[in-house]
């Protein structure tokens, strides 16, 4: 195969070519992953970006997303409103202490109220004062122009709003908002010079064509960062009994997303531990970014395990926007 060589030299795969690569059973997954690694290495070397999530508001949501344990159909006991500013700031302090490059503040719900945006912006201003090098990502749901402008002014660097699935499959996943609603929010953030982060959830019953459509939709949207989540089935949700992924299938998905979006930050995100299992390290041959710590309502593995995984691969944490002593602190953590 010379796919990687062509891409590195400026060639862009067509949708049909990507589909053929992804579905051709004569192409071994590790062969495809090797092509993805060549592309990843060309653009990002062996560096890995670290991201951390704070669940700032949980379970209070009118939406019916079929994958989500915080949807309107789930009567969770651990629901809570937007947490105090001090707790949001404390989360950022913890992120900085753990050598994290991007701190993501996440809220459940359809979208933020203006009062909630005020709350977030005040928190972000203090975070930026304390940790000017820490990138702040907001994930607050559907947002409007005025809210985007205020978030930008406060110092928000990135906004996450996932497409989650293909346009064709969207209404099978959720009915309380449209695919176009999601695209519009990402476009609004771009118009306000906030870096767009948008990704997918795989393993919800979508087809191979849906996955290729997702990869190209994100390419067209020009998302700077693409988190790839793998369904972690939650009992009681629409997809709570779904179990169609294997570690090798997950690796193939990550590989094709890299080949379609060669220059973008591709992150292995929610569900990586339960779906990739012992093959987690191989995902970083195509992806160049991970979430560390816990997710929204499911647990992750200890940070030190991720640091060790990166080190064992011969890779290194991307410290480009972190304090100068970050690399030394990581080494001290691993040797402790």
UniProtKB/Swiss-Prot annotation:
Keyword S-adenosyl-L-methionine among record annotations: yes
Top EC category: transferase
Listed GO biological process terms: biotin biosynthetic process
Gene Ontology MF terms in the entry: 2 iron, 2 sulfur cluster binding; 4 iron, 4 sulfur cluster binding; biotin synthase activity; iron ion binding
Pathway annotation: Cofactor biosynthesis; biotin biosynthesis; biotin from 7,8-diaminononanoate: step 2/2
Domain Radical SAM core: residue ranges: 43-269
Residue ranges crossing the lipid bilayer per the database entry: none
Superkingdom to which the source organism belongs: Bacteria
Database matches in SUPFAM superfamilies: Radical SAM enzymes
Residues that coordinate or bind [4Fe-4S] cluster: 61, 65, 68
Catalytic activity: (4R,5S)-dethiobiotin + (sulfur carrier)-SH + 2 reduced [2Fe-2S]-[ferredoxin] + 2 S-adenosyl-L-methionine = (sulfur carrier)-H + biotin + 2 5'-deoxyadenosine + 2 L-methionine + 2 oxidized [2Fe-2S]-[ferredoxin]
Cofactor note: Binds 1 [4Fe-4S] cluster. The cluster is coordinated with 3 cysteines and an exchangeable S-adenosyl-L-methionine.
Catalytic activity, EC: 2.8.1.6
HAMAP family xref list: BioB
Role played: Catalyzes the conversion of dethiobiotin (DTB) to biotin by the insertion of a sulfur atom into dethiobiotin via a radical-based mechanism.
Subunit-level organization: Homodimer.
NCBIfam families, per the entry: bioB
PANTHER family: BIOTIN SYNTHASE, BIOTIN SYNTHASE, MITOCHONDRIAL
Family: Belongs to the radical SAM superfamily. Biotin synthase family.
Protein name: Biotin synthase
Annotated organism of origin: Staphylococcus carnosus (strain TM300)
Gene name of this polypeptide: bioB
């Amino acid at each position: 195969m010379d796919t990687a060589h062509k891409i590195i030299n400026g060639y862009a795969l067509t949708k049909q070519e990507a589909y053929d690569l992804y579905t051709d059973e004569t192409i071994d997954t590790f062969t495809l992953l090797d092509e993805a690694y060549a592309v990843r290495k060309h653009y990002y070397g062996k560096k890995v970006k670290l991201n951390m999530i704070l669940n700032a508001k949980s379970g209070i949501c009118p939406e019916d997303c079929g994958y989500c344990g915080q949807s309107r159909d789930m009567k969770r006991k651990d629901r809570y409103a937007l947490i105090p500013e001090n707790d949001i700031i404390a989360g950022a302090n913890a992120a900085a202490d753990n050598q994290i490059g991007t701190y993501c503040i996440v809220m459940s719900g359809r979208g933020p109220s203006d009062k909630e945006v005020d709350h977030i912006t005040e928190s972000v201003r203090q975070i930026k004062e304390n940790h000017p090098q820490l990138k702040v990502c907001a994930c607050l749901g559907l947002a409007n122009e005025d809210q985007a402008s205020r978030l930008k002014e406060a110092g928000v660097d990135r906004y996450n709003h996932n497409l989650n699935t293909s346009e064709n499959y969207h209404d099978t996943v959720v009915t309380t908002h449209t695919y176009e609603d999601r695209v519009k929010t990402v476009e609004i953030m771009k118009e306000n010079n906030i870096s767009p982060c948008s990704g997918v959830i795989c393993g919800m019953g979508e087809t191979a064509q849906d996955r290729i459509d997702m990869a190209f939709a994100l390419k067209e949207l020009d998302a700077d960062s693409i988190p790839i989540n793998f369904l972690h089935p939650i009992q009681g949700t629409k997809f709570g009994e779904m179990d169609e992924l294997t570690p090798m299938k997950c690796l193939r998905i990550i590989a094709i997303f890299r080949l379609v979006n060669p220059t973008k930050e591709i992150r292995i995100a929610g569900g990586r531990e339960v779906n990739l299992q012992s093959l987690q390290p191989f995902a970083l041959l195509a992806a160049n970014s991970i979430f560390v710590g816990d997710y929204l309502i499911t647990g992750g593995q200890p940070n030190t395990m991720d640091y060790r995984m990166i080190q064992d691969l011969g890779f290194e944490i991307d410290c480009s926007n972190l304090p100068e002593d970050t690399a030394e602190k990581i080494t001290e953590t691993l040797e402790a």
